[in-house]
């Protein structure tokens, strides 16, 4: 038995500009749907057989992220849930691997946001096929977390050495600028 929880949604922009419906949608899809799918598959699984779960979180799960506050927090929930569930399932032959990629070029909007980040967007983004194949390799080896790309792993490590308030400030400055470039490109006031 295996399950890959890959669904997720984000509405970039300041929290105060998000509608309650947008906030609920992020929580429903990024958290509630994942928990429901996970619980359902665990209820159906044959405990005499190996079980692998892959949850797609985000590199954002490691940081407080202005302009992506709801998304980053929802992905942090998913990371913490996955690590805890991994320990619960370990004695019963289950493993949980959490994928934490940077931007993924999956839609025109995602590509626009990656491009708005300039060089950092280009060097942190990995090909979807590459990430999928490597994620499966890591899951089969029983790894707990997979962060694709050396630059992303270095960013994760550096983020752990800096006080969270400074991380939030630096990310807010960086993402705020990228967000403004996306809004200009899309002709959104």
Residues covered by each model-derived region:
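Active-site helix of classical SDR
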Residues: 38, 74
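Substrate-binding pocket helix/loop in short-chain dehydrogenase/reductase
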Residues: 14-15, 19-27
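Active-site-adjacent segment of SDR/Rossmann-fold oxidoreductases
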Residues: 45, 63, 84-95
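Residue(s) in the substrate-gating loop at a strand-loop-helix junction
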Residues: 58
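C-terminal helical subdomain
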Residues: 98, 119-156
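Active-site loop immediately N-terminal to the catalytic Tyr-X3-Lys motif
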Residues: 16, 65-69
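Conserved NAD(P)H cofactor-binding loop of Rossmann-fold oxidoreductase domains
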Residues: 6-11
């Amino acid at each position: 038995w295996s399950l890959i929880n890959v669904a997720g949604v984000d509405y970039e922009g300041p929290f105060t500009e998000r509608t309650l419906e947008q906030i609920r949608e992020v929580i429903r899809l990024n958290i509630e749907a994942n928990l429901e799918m996970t619980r359902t598959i665990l209820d159906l699984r044959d405990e005499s057989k190996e079980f692998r779960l892959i949850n797609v979180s985000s590199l954002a799960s490691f940081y407080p992220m202005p302009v992506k506050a709801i998304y980053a927090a929802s992905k942090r929930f998913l990371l913490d849930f996955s690590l805890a569930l991994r320990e619960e399932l370990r004695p019963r032959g289950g493993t949980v691997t959490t994928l934490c990629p940077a931007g993924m070029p999956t839609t025109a909007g995602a590509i626009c946001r990656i491009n708005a980040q300039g060089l950092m967007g280009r060097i942190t983004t990995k090909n979807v096929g590459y990430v999928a194949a490597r994620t499966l390799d890591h899951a089969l080896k029983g790894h707990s977390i997979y962060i694709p790309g050396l630059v992303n792993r270095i960013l994760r490590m550096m983020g752990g050495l800096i006080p969270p308030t400074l991380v939030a400030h630096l990310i807010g400055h960086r993402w705020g600028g990228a967000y403004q470039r996306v809004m200009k490109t899309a002709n959104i006031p």
